[in-house]
């Protein structure tokens, strides 16, 4: 404990804007796919709960990490 080592981020801060953009675009794609999937169903009696949950889970994960890196890009360190 005499000598403390400096913390180094696992992700280079120079790639935060690019990473945020890519993650937000992928999340927006999954969100659009989810809305199109729900609206274009022929009958509402179809049981597609698992597929809807998986698409929405992917969308929320990508959008969540995209927003975190967007906040880091603009200087809001969370």
UniProtKB/Swiss-Prot annotation:
GO biological process terms, semicolon-separated: nuclear envelope organization; nuclear migration; response to endoplasmic reticulum stress
Entry keywords, A to Z: Cytoplasm, Endoplasmic reticulum, Membrane, Nucleus, Transmembrane, Transmembrane helix
Membrane topology category: Multi-pass membrane protein
GO molecular function: oligosaccharyltransferase complex binding
Subcellular location per the Swiss-Prot or TrEMBL entry: Nucleus outer membrane; Cytoplasm; Endoplasmic reticulum membrane
Transmembrane segments: 19-39, 54-74
A Pfam family assignment: Ost5
Cytoplasmic side of membrane: 1-18, 40-53
Intervals, Perinuclear space compartment: 75-78
Deleted gene: phenotype: Homozygous mutants display growth retardation and dy as larvae and show defects in ovarian follicle cells, which enwrap the germ cell clusters in ovarioles.
Main location: nucleus
GO terms for cellular component: cytoplasm; endoplasmic reticulum membrane; nuclear outer membrane; oligosaccharyltransferase complex
Main function: Subunit of the oligosaccharyl transferase (OST) complex that catalyzes the initial transfer of a defined glycan (Glc(3)Man(9)GlcNAc(2) in eukaryotes) from the lipid carrier dolichol-pyrophosphate to an asparagine residue within an Asn-X-Ser/Thr consensus motif in nascent polypeptide chains, the first step in protein N-glycosylation. N-glycosylation occurs cotranslationally and the complex associates with the Sec61 complex at the channel-forming translocon complex that mediates protein translocation across the endoplasmic reticulum (ER). All subunits are required for a maximal enzyme activity.
Subunit structure: Homodimer. Component of the oligosaccharyltransferase (OST) complex. Interacts with klar and Msp300, components of LINC complex.
Family according to the record: Belongs to the OST5 family.
Protein name: Transmembrane protein 258
Organism the protein comes from: Drosophila melanogaster (Fruit fly)
């Amino acid at each position: 404990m005499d000598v403390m080592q400096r913390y180094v981020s696992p992700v280079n801060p120079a790639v935060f804007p690019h990473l945020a953009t890519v993650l937000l675009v992928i999340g927006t794609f999954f969100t659009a796919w989810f809305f199109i999937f729900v609206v274009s169903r022929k009958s509402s009696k179809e049981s597609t709960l698992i597929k809807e949950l998986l698409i929405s889970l992917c969308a929320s994960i990508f959008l969540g990490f995209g927003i975190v890196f967007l906040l880091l890009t603009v200087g809001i360190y969370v």
